[in-house]
A protein has these predicted regions:
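Phosphate-binding site recognition
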Residues: 1-181
Length: 181
């Protein structure tokens, strides 16, 4: 619920419709209201990625990311041929798609389209990691997610802000060396 609220607050898409959700609330009279509807928002939840092996886990990740790209299909019109190929490799779930950097690439595409930095919301970031630990493919999963999250949140010049939720302490997992905000 909190992540949805953040999405509705910041998302540049449907900003006028979303503004109505905050009418009559304290934030409506706050200086923060000037930020409402100002950013493209990438919202991804990993709550349903609970697979028994890495192959199935990665298949579900590809489907999830493809669906995310599908929701931003309109940005394709602003991409050059090389960028379009990168977008389409994910969109069509090709094996050669750069899934480790998919969120960072999507943030680049959105930044290019909207000419403003992007907010990334990741809900239940740790569900696939817990499942991987329980089912014996932790090393493969942690290797993927370390890059997936770091490229999106740590080394991303197109990022305005990122928010993650989960039950594991990020510092304990060692997923983000040097990412402590």
């Amino acid at each position: 619920l909190n992540m949805s609220m953040l999405q509705y607050f910041w998302d540049i898409q449907n900003q006028e419709e979303h503004r109505k959700l905050f009418q009559g609330l304290e934030i409506e009279h706050s200086p923060y209201m000037a930020e409402q509807g100002k950013y493209p928002v990438i919202f991804i939840t990993l709550k349903d990625i609970k697979e028994r092996n890495w192959k199935d886990c990665f298949t579900q990740i590809k489907i999830l990311v493809k669906n995310l790209y599908n929701s931003f299909e309109f940005v394709r019109s602003s991409l050059n041929p090389s960028e379009l190929r990168s977008f389409d490799k994910i969109w069509f779930e090709e094996e050669s798609g750069d899934y480790r950097n998919a969120l960072k690439m999507l943030s680049f595409f959105l930044k290019k389209y909207y000419q403003t930095k992007v907010i990334i919301l990741i809900d239940e970031y740790d569900t696939p990691i817990v499942s991987a630990y329980e089912h014996g493919y932790y090393e493969e999963a942690i290797s993927f997610f370390r890059n997936f999250y770091s490229s999106a949140l740590k080394d991303n010049e197109y990022l305005q802000m990122g928010v993650m939720t989960g039950i594991l302490r990020v510092a304990k997992e060692g997923i983000f060396s040097g990412l402590n905000n």
